[in-house]
Amino acid sequence: MSDSEDVALSELSSRNGIKKEDEEMPLAQLNGNGNAKLRKRKHSEKSKDDHKDKKRKKEKKLSKEKVNNKVKDELISAPVTPKKTPKISKTPVSATSSPAPKKEDSVETDEGYKWWEDENFGEGDERWQTLEHNGVLFPPPYEPLPSYVKLYYEGKPVDLPPLAEEVAGYFAAMIETDHAKNPVFQQNFFNDFLQVLKEGGGCNVDIKEFSKCDFSKMAAFFEKQREEKKSMSKAEKQRIKEEKEKLEEPFKTCLMDGRRENVGNFRVEPPGLFRGRGAHPKTGKFKRRVFPEDITLNLGEGAPIPPPPEGHQWGGIRHDKTVVWLAMWRENISDTFKYVKLAANSSIKGISDMKKFETARKLKDHIERIRADYQKMLKDQFMQNRQIATATYLIDIFALRAGGEKGEDEADTVGCCSLRYEHVTLKPPNKVIFDFLGKDSIRFYQEVEVDRQVFKNLRIFKKEPKGPGDDLFDRITPTILNKHLQNYMKGLTAKVFRTYNASKTMQDQMDLISNEGTVAEKVVKYNAANRTVAILCNHQRTVSKNHEQAVKRINDKIRELEWQKIRLKKMILDIDETEKKDNPKYFEELDDLTNDEMNVIVERVIERQKDQAEKKWNRDNEKRKMEKEELLTKADLQEKLDKIEETRKDYLEEIKTGVVRATKGSSVSSLKSKVETVENRIVNTSYQLKDKEDNSEVSLGTSKMNYIDPRLTVVFAKKFNVPIEKLFTKTLRDKFNWAIESTDENWRF
């Protein structure tokens, strides 16, 4: 999957979210007799759905929509063709392609279409019958730097060809980042920079060493651009946003079987320097610009072909109803295909998600037999069967990914089947230490107790002459393992265990939760259950640089609320001193904060109020300027700041005397009601703090989005009367609308 980090910082265009979907690639094929380890994955741009039961009963007529994807009339420099091109039948399309279709009012929108109530939806080989779309949105062409902004080599200014200048600019724009300080990143960048420089005809200086390059002038230019962007007025930002939305609008949706569906990633990735995750060997390499000639479109037969940018033509046109991508191209870094597909909230993606979770749910009917069988196979006389059983055990019990072989130019991440000698340490009688880099180069480190026979098998798998670098499971691959699992259940693969165990664990955790407490308390309980799943799946994350500041802000907020509560209770005593005699426990916390602590709180509150007043003054003036009204003066602002300063003096006087005068119109009952409100806020904020600290190193979102059946979250929301908005973000509510609409509180995984 493409990483949003790969967006070039020197581009002012928006981030792109192109995904690389593995389901478009065939399963790796075995060499020879099937026992040899697969050394290289074979890629293909085409894959077919496994469901072949029924065909759609009716073909819906497609209303035609006017294609409005006129691309800016800016010249695009000559394309750089990737090393390999897709082996597909190409239909060249010139810039004068078919006219755009007329838009009709009869187009059915996807909104409100409940595909999960259609028994035939998603069945059969063909995923759609009619498909129209407007192609893809290309990033803006490169804008050369001003003549005074140059790369320097040994103190001399360098006149670079346009493409070489562009590549140098990508490095300069991120020169202060950790990536740019990585020696591997620097070397890969410099190698590609020299190659691009050679392609462009060279320059006036003989550049040979990275250490002699001075990017400071370029870096300063990009920093100035960033500062200018930050200092834009609200009106300017709004104008840019509207222009961007207008440009993107034609590409956001497509027409599939007469319904308008959202497109998930309609932008072509901009060029830049590849970053990658973890210790990726290709970090820093130049990700080249993608041109129309590199792109193949998938459309319905007879559908109007979107016109390519002027002077270009599409690489090919396909009419493949068995796949759901709209466009594809080969990316030069990983030499794999990237696909433009429908959005997460589309009907096609929804049915895919539902089938995934239903497949995992069906596993509960087979899991006991599978476990009984692999326990027997652990002692099988054939070594391959022992390895299959041992791998299945590890995948089932410890939620390991299946894993596959990686090339030398890929990050050294592993899963169960690709574990090597050095990744497993054995401690008799039955303890195993796993230590390896998993997906996204996240370290998997666990010391666990395993079945005695599993321990014995692992010891056998590590026997001499094996040593560091040798495969532990040298008789199996994920393909062999999955073929074995297919005997138990249609669609069962190693990764289904992960979804099953994540959802089963969530169900078990939810069964332990009592329906008590406030909404905030229930959300914390839900997150604790989610965290158990995330830990099982090893969904870690690095503690953010801002974590300590975020925790401090929440702690400060709690202290401010405690101070507010003390002030309110002192107001009660100002009205009726006998309250303290009648209920001394209620007033015990009056001395919880020292005068020094309260002074610090007051200064913080006052500074925030002043800052808010200045920001509001600026916002109001922006609005008045747009509406051509008289602007507020500095005197107006100063008047507000003076009032805030008076409040500050009053607060400090309260701290000094210990007396807080009740506000006009206050009563004991109204003040007690306010105290209760503040106490509830303290409780809720404390839960927020606990959540923040508990989940600082655990990523809850990954398991919630990909592994926990969303219907479990819906059940929790309905059963415990928690608004679904507290558990699912807007994105997840859209993605899992099918679960929200079709699940009641009695559903079980």
UniProtKB/Swiss-Prot annotation:
**Which top EC class is given?**
isomerase
Which Gene3D superfamilies does the UniProt record give?
1.10.132.10, DNA Topoisomerase I, domain 2 (2.170.11.10), Topoisomerase I, Chain A, domain 3 (3.90.15.10), Yeast DNA topoisomerase - domain 1 (1.10.10.41)
Entry's InterPro entries? Answer: DNA_brk_join_enz, DNA_topo_DNA_db_N_dom1, DNA_topo_DNA_db_N_dom2, TopoI, TopoI_C_dom, TopoI_cat_a-hlx-sub_euk, TopoI_cat_a/b-sub_euk, TopoI_cat_euk
At the top level of its lineage, which domain of life is listed? Answer: Eukaryota
Q: Where is the composition biased (Basic and acidic residues)?
A: 62-75, 101-110
**Coiled-coil stretches:** none
GO annotations under biological process? Answer: chromosome segregation; DNA replication; DNA topological change
Q: Which UniProt keywords apply?
A: DNA-binding, Isomerase, Nucleus, Topoisomerase
Gene Ontology, cellular component aspect: chromosome; nucleolus; nucleoplasm
Chief place where the protein resides? nucleus
Job of this protein: Releases the supercoiling and torsional tension of DNA introduced during the DNA replication and transcription by transiently cleaving and rejoining one strand of the DNA duplex. Introduces a single-strand break via transesterification at the specific target site 5'-[CT]CCTTp site in duplex DNA. The scissile phosphodiester is attacked by the catalytic tyrosine of the enzyme, resulting in the formation of a DNA-(3'-phosphotyrosyl)-enzyme intermediate and the expulsion of a 5'-OH DNA strand. The free DNA strand then undergoes passage around the unbroken strand thus removing DNA supercoils.
Question: What name goes with this protein?
Answer: DNA topoisomerase 1
The encoding gene is: TOP1
